[in-house]
Amino acid sequence: MSEKLRVGILGATGMVVQRFISLLENHPWFEVVTLAASPRSAGKTYEEAVGGRWKMDTPMPEAVKNIVVMNVNEVEKVASTVDFVFSAVDMSKDEIKAIEEEYAKTETPVVSNNSAHRWTPDVPMVVPEINPEHFDVIQYQKKRLGTTKGFIAVKPNCSIQSYAPVLTAWKEFEPYEVVATTYQAISGAGKTFKDWPEMEHNIIPYIGGEEEKSEKEPLRLWGKIEDGVIVPATEPVITCQCLRVPVLNGHTAAVFVKFRKKPTKEQLIEALRNFRGLPQELELPSAPKHFIQYLEEDNRPQVSEDVNYEHGMGVSVGRLREDTVYDYKFVGLSHNTVRGAAGGAVLCAETLKAKGYITKK
């Protein structure tokens, strides 16, 4: 066994977990040693537990096929085998909150893909290029939990990855009002067209809970730590509509922005191309070299051309132009199960390791 950190994944048979497993194959720092799921999957090998439901383009990694799935509710037992866990469990919000805290209290850091703790005041919700300083709130969370090493960190909703990084890159121009419509892939619901044939040739103009997340979560990313909790920003005000569209992977957003300090188009494009964050400075294993690309062509970004930009960890932007009602409008695209889910969580874990929050037990 190498000096890699031992990783457990909670919720082991779902689509996001499959993406975690694919991304962590041959990872230089992390090694998946434990998979935990519901009692009905426990005791089976991972290959048996998933059955014919492997949904990735690449085959199931050999290294995980014969891992015997543990019962996610046997917290002490699972925690004793790992240095930290990724959480992508399918339970009620209250159950997720409780089980993630139970894991943290065993001195096991939890990096969560779930929404349950996104508004817990002392839990950092982080996109590492945008707000890595929010990890500083962990010291206060540990006091509340009574832990020395255990804590919970979360990543935000997949829908905001196509525009929150862009607005962050434009912060100096003070965006204060934003209108967005997102066009979200079916893999965001954990589905493929085989599972959800009624989505072919169809658009559904509603995704439960998604609009509120899309409006509020960016403000938490841009917030500040005060008195041991994260206080969200109040601007820009965002209004959003979220549509489910017949695309397998990739969330697209059409966005309109007003600025207090109206820039030129050239200034906006330059800000996108120059935008770098901590993961780029630290050259973390999963970090895109260039987080945001700007495409000049009128017909880009396109899902078929651009969703895998920087292995799905980058954001593609195009069609930036002045608007008749707002100052500017643009289209953004990101990969919802890579940057928007498992890949974003892996990058959070890499950042936490680099900052000394996750270590060997």
Task: Identify the residue ranges that each predicted region occupies.
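N-terminal Rossmann-like NAD(P) cofactor-binding subdomain of oxidoreductases
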Residues: 2-205, 237, 315-316, 320-323, ...
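Charged docking surfaces used in two-component/phosphorelay signaling
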Residues: 187-361
